[in-house]
Structure formats: C-alpha cells, structure tokens
Swiss-Prot record:
Keywords, comma-separated and alphabetical: Cell membrane, Membrane, Transmembrane, Transmembrane helix
UniProt-listed InterPro entries: Preflagellin_Peptidase (IPR052218), Prepilin_IV_endopep_pep (IPR000045)
Native organism taxonomy: Archaea, Methanobacteriati, Methanobacteriota, Methanomada group, Methanococci
Annotated protein name in UniProt: Uncharacterized protein MJ1282.1
Native source organism of the sequence: Methanocaldococcus jannaschii (strain ATCC 43067 / DSM 2661 / JAL-1 / JCM 10045 / NBRC 100440) (Methanococcus jannaschii)
GO molecular-function term, one example from the UniProt record: aspartic-type endopeptidase activity
TM spans (from-to): 33-53, 70-90, 92-112, 133-153, 223-243
Subcellular location: Cell membrane
Length: 254
C-alpha cells in the first residue's frame, strides 16, 4: 500500500462525508492530489525537466481554480500535461488528460456532478488511469443497490400508480415528496404530468414556485460515497467487479 494510495484513500473518505452531507466537494481535494502526485512521481522519475513541466501544469490548474479571473490558465495546464506526455511519455500526464476528457463528457451529459469528475481527474494523476478506471467501474456497481432502495421506497409509498409507462424508470432514481420539503441539494424533475427522466444536476435549480403539491426529485447520487467504498474494496479485489457480475449474469442465462 503506497503513499499515493493512502493519500487518495484519505481524500475519498473526507470527500464521501462531504458529499453525503452537502452534495458538494471542496476543490482542495482534487487539487491536493495533483500536488501530492507530482512530488511522489519525482521519487520514481528523476527527470527534473519532466518534474518542472508537470509542476507548472499543476500550478496553472491550481490558479485557474483558485482565482476566477485566471480560469483560462487551466488550458495552459492541460497543454503542459500534453507536452509532458509527448516529450517523456508520462503515464500520469496521459492519465490526467484521459480523465479530463472523460470528466468533461460526463459533466456536460449530466451523468455526473463537477465535483465527482474533478475528483477522478485528481485521482487519475495521483494513481494512474488504470487504477482510476477500476475505482470508477466498481463505484458504478455500488449505485445498483442504491437505486433498488429508492425503488422499494417508491413501491411502498405507491408512487408508481399514477406514472405513465414511459416514466417508470423514474422509480429507480427519484422520490416523490411535497414541494415544501425539497432540500437544496435535490433536483426537481417535475410532477406527474410534466416529467423529465434526465435530471439537470449541473444547472441552476428549478424554481419551486412553478409547482404545487407533490413533485418528483432526485436526491443526486452521492457518488463520492461509492468511490470511497470502491476504494476500500480495491484492497480485497483489485479488479473491476462489475465485469464479473456481467459475466455471471450472462452465464446464468446461456
């Protein structure tokens, strides 16, 4: 168990607690993983030029996050990581670039929140993309029982009775509650008459005043909690278990 793994574990535990309580994650976590990573990698790669290129990449990214007026500096940081990969075949620079693109893709498709995507970027540079892919895929596996739990609550409360057939998938991802009880980190998806199956988790919250009575809301999955569980699971099984589950399902039907 190396230093990078231990620091990533600490960040995942802290992030999980923050995500569960507020559905928000401080930028300090993923930025700190970049800084810790750049110094850990120096221990294994003695090239000072590589070190300086990547430390300036991390510095520019940090400034872009810390000061809004410097937000364009992130592109210089990304370019320096690309330069590091081209010149030195830096695995960790490539890992960051891969998850930078994956994060943008997941964020703009509303599949994940910005904090979750940035955490994966930081982790990918700290521990590499293959490790991060395993953590990410196993975290998805933990989403399944969470969705089943939401389904059972909806069935118990009879929330399925007025739903149209096309909206039944909503039972796995959203709960029905009074408009006055919607919390700040919950996203309104509509009422029984006007529904959206894709929550806009990265957009401004919809005004409550447009609805009356009960509405469907998604609690926004605390994905860092699942990442933390996946991180701990890695100690026992450093393999994407979701592939094993798929394999067992296929074998049971053929």
């Amino acid at each position: 168990m190396d230093l990078g793994y231990l620091y990533g574990l600490i960040c995942s535990i802290y992030g999980a607690v923050e995500d569960w309580r507020k559905r928000e994650v401080t930028d300090f976590l993923w930025i700190s993983m970049l800084w810790v990573g750049v110094f850990i990698h120096l221990l294994y790669n003695k090239s000072l030029l590589l070190f300086f290129i990547e430390i300036f990449a991390v510095l520019f990214i940090t400034l872009s996050v810390r000061y809004e007026k410097f937000n364009k500096l992130v592109y210089i940081g990304v370019f320096l990581f690309l330069l590091s990969f081209i010149l030195f075949k830096s695995y960790f620079a490539l890992s960051f670039l891969v998850f930078y693109l994956i994060g943008i893709f997941l964020y703009y498709l509303n599949f994940m929140g910005g904090g979750d995507c940035k955490f994966l970027m930081g982790l990918s540079y700290l521990k590499g993309m293959f490790f991060t892919f395993i953590i990410f895929l196993n975290a998805i596996l933990f989403v399944i029982p969470y969705c089943i739990f939401i389904l059972l609550i909806n069935l118990k409360n009879g929330n399925h009775k007025r739903l149209k057939l096309k909206n039944l998938p909503l039972l796995f991802i959203a709960l029905k509650k009074d408009i006055d009880k919607v919390k700040k980190f919950e996203t309104i998806m509509g009422d029984d008459e006007n529904l959206s199956l894709i929550p806009n988790i990265n957009e401004e919250k919809e005004e409550k005043k447009t609805y009356k009575g009960k509405v469907w809301v998604t609690p926004q999955l605390p994905f860092l909690v699942f990442i933390c569980l996946s991180y701990i699971l890695y100690i026992v099984s450093p393999f994407p278990l979701i592939f094993k589950v798929i394999e067992l399902v296929i074998k049971s039907h053929f």
